[in-house]
Amino acid sequence: MLGITNISQSQAQPPNHVYELRMYHTVPGRLTALVNRFRDYTVPIFAKHDMHAIGYWVPQDTPELFVYVLEHPSRDAATKNWAAFMADPEWVKAKADSEASGKIVDHVDNYFMNPADFSKLK
């Protein structure tokens, strides 16, 4: 019974951070354009808006996919940071310029995640 109580209390506590998993499915042949846009523009603009990346990945077995994880203090902070990012004139220009030769992203899957109690990331 004590173990169940501890689990319930652990789950009831708010997490210190929320993590956002984002998976970008690119238009065929446009993965390199997306990676370049992230390297050259998106990452520095994220920093301006307190969007902290944990890492970026290109899966070995899934072509046309780009994956990254952001850390946010809360879901509310994530919403505010994304709104500021999307309205940033530097981002608007970078997106338009990078898509001058065609759309890059087909669709995005994203998930907000809380760390498990045994996770090294809290």
Predicted segment positions?
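An amphipathic, aromatic/His-enriched active-site/gating alpha helix that lines ligand/cofactor pockets
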Residues: 11-15, 36-54, 62, 71-116
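Bacterial Sec-dependent signal peptides at the C-terminal "C-region" and cleavage site
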Residues: 1-14
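Short, solvent-exposed loop/turn elements at domain surfaces
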Residues: 33, 119-121
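Active-site-flanking beta-strand signature of metal-NTP-handling nucleotidyl enzymes
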Residues: 19-23, 67
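Short, surface-exposed ligand-recognition loops at beta-strand->loop->(often short) alpha-helix junctions
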Residues: 26-36
